[in-house]
Amino acid sequence: MKNYFSKIVLSVGLVIGTCSVGLAQQTIFNVPSTDVLDKGKVYAELDASFKPSDSTAVSRFSSFVPRVVVGAGSNVEIGLNLTGNIQPGPDSTTLVPAVKWKPYQGKDNGWAIVLGDHLFLPVHNRGYNAGNYVYAEVSKTFKGGTRLTAGGYDFTRNVVSSANRAGGQFGFEQPINKKLTIAADWFTGKHSAGYFTPGVVFKIGPKVTGYAGYSIGNQNASNGNHFFLLEIGYNFN
């Protein structure tokens, strides 16, 4: 699974272990969104991935990934994830600093472009010295609020697989009302970040957002390669 990572994070972290790429940025579930925090804004999130029962492909586990994201100005945000916290078994703690830049935001046409990079720095039970995840994305927001995201990624070896991996990353967001959004994202490929995650995003209060999804592996899904993903985020200002 996602590097138990969460993911590809669990990632990647996202190595995150095994469950989620643990991306130190604003995301849909695992795939980065094209949102960028304004200068001085601070956002914190805790991701929890878990599988309550054993299966052929994936054993019972739980994983927790905290992250913080800060708006740096000039359409740039920076972040930090702490991945590799997995039970049962030894932790493989990994620091994941990240940066996201939005070079284009259409005012009326709904288009946006972002570029991003994550550096993976294992600090405990290290399986490799350092790794990298780089991506480019474009999104289109329609008048009804629907947003579609598509892009490409590259993971260096040992982050989500023993070899370098490249592919596509995609997202879908459909607001139902001011408090509820149906969403899904997907990393292509057969590696620890290769999951499709549908779910819902819901506003708990003016500063708190909840996420509930279910990650389904691109391979061995019929043998149990799937798990729950819960996230809670807080906007400090």
Residue ranges and their predicted role:
Residues 1-28, 237:
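Cleavable N-terminal export/targeting peptides
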Residues 23-158, 172-181, 185-237:
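Transmembrane beta-barrel domains of Gram-negative outer membranes and organellar outer membranes
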Residues 163-170:
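Short loop-to-alpha-helix "cap/lid" segments that border enzyme active sites
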